[in-house]
């Protein structure tokens, strides 16, 4: 009997697929947020993260949107002027297409992770041409495959003015905003076009937020095709209470939608994650939430335990709090 039982067990094991992944959470937060009328609850990935079947399993089970963490930024896509590399971005887009996930493209124009050749441009016409050509090629390559683009990323200083250490501001002044958005609209007419920025929800950044609101209202009134504003929402514990008011102020600028785009909260307090989730639910123009990573071990704030899943890909109390907030 013992021998035959062993044979039976062995035959069952042999018949099982080689790569069964456990369900890391009891409910999909993407499914729950869509039931509330929102478009997605998302996360990030990139070619290095796609190597992890555990990471992929969590994304497929629990999320509905992905943002490429680095593979669509300027240094990755056009490291040398006029020479483009879409390999990393293609991997993310293909993974998304295979699994029914929306993609937020990130980021077409950003002063950081920028090749030196762009920093070296001092002539207005050359800078305008560089922006237009970059966006034409990158957004054009992914045309029809990306739900939304962060066209401009982190363009404001703490005083609400345009960032002074940006080569785009230094060479073109405010003109680069219209140049970038019009190029993006031409390259992919159906993608939602965003300004994405930091600390909008920080009570200590009132000038930054006021400056952004005033600038975006002006740009929208000028016909610049800005569809949305993204709030990165990198928070410390206890700082979630300002998120809803920030989203409401962003929504008041005349844009069609707003989103939480890079959410993480140091130490991942469950109550704070619930507060942020409810903030999006309470603002009609908020279309979704993206957390900036799956597992704590892969977070840019990895020592802070800021995400919804721990280093073993197990759902944390913060995940349960999000589920409860969405019920």
From Swiss-Prot:
Induction details: Expression is under the control of transcription factor XYR1 and highly induced by xylan, carboxymethylcellulose (CMC), and hop cell wall.
Catalytic residue positions: 154 (proton donor), 262 (nucleophile)
Cystine pairs: 280-286
GO BP, sorted A to Z: xylan catabolic process
Entries under InterPro entries matching the protein: GH10, GH10_dom, Glycoside_hydrolase_SF
A GO MF term: endo-1,4-beta-xylanase activity
Chief localization: secreted
Source organism superkingdom: Eukaryota
Keywords: Carbohydrate metabolism, Disulfide bond, Glycosidase, Hydrolase, Polysaccharide degradation, Secreted, Signal, Virulence, Xylan degradation
Location in the cell: Secreted
pH-related activity note: Optimum pH is 5.0-7.0.
Keyword Secreted: yes
Cellular component terms per the entry's GO annotation: extracellular region
Temperature dependence of activity: Optimum temperature is 40 degrees Celsius.
Xref: PANTHER family: ENDO-1,4-BETA-XYLANASE C, GLYCOSYL HYDROLASE
Protein name: Endo-1,4-beta-xylanase C
Native species: Gibberella zeae (strain ATCC MYA-4620 / CBS 123657 / FGSC 9075 / NRRL 31084 / PH-1) (Wheat head blight fungus)
């Amino acid at each position: 009997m013992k021998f035959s039982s062993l044979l039976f067990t062995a035959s069952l094991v042999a018949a099982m697929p080689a790569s069964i992944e456990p369900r890391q959470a009891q409910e999909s937060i993407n499914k729950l947020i869509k039931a509330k009328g929102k478009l997605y609850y998302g996360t990030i990935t990139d070619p290095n993260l796609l190597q992890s079947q555990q990471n992929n399993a969590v994304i497929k089970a629990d999320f509905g949107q992905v943002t490429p963490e680095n593979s669509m930024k300027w240094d990755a896509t056009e490291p040398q002027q006029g020479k483009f590399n879409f390999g990393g971005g293609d991997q993310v887009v293909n993974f998304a297409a295979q699994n029914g996930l929306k993609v937020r493209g990130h980021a077409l124009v950003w002063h950081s992770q920028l090749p030196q050749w762009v920093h070296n441009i001092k002539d207005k016409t050359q800078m305008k041409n560089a922006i237009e050509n970059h966006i034409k090629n990158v957004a054009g390559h992914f045309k029809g495959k990306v739900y939304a683009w962060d066209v401009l990323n982190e363009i404001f200083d703490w005083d609400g003015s345009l960032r002074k250490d940006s080569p785009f501001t230094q060479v073109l002044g405010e003109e680069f905003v219209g140049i970038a958005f019009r190029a993006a609209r031409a390259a992919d007419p159906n993608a939602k076009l965003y300004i994405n920025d930091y600390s909008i929800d920080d009570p200590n950044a009132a000038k930054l937020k006021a400056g952004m609101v005033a600038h975006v209202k002006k740009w929208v009134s000028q016909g610049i095709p800005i569809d949305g504003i993204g709030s990165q929402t990198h928070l410390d514990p206890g700082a979630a209470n300002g998120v809803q008011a920030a989203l409401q102020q962003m929504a008041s600028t005349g844009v069609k939608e707003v989103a939480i785009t890079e959410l993480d909260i140091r130490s991942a307090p469950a109550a704070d994650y619930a507060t942020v989730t409810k903030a999006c639910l309470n603002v009609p123009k908020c279309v979704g939430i993206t957390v900036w990573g799956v597992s704590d071990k892969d977070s840019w704030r990895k020592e802070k335990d800021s995400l919804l899943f721990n280093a073993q890909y197990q759902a944390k109390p913060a995940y349960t709090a999000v589920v409860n907030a969405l019920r």
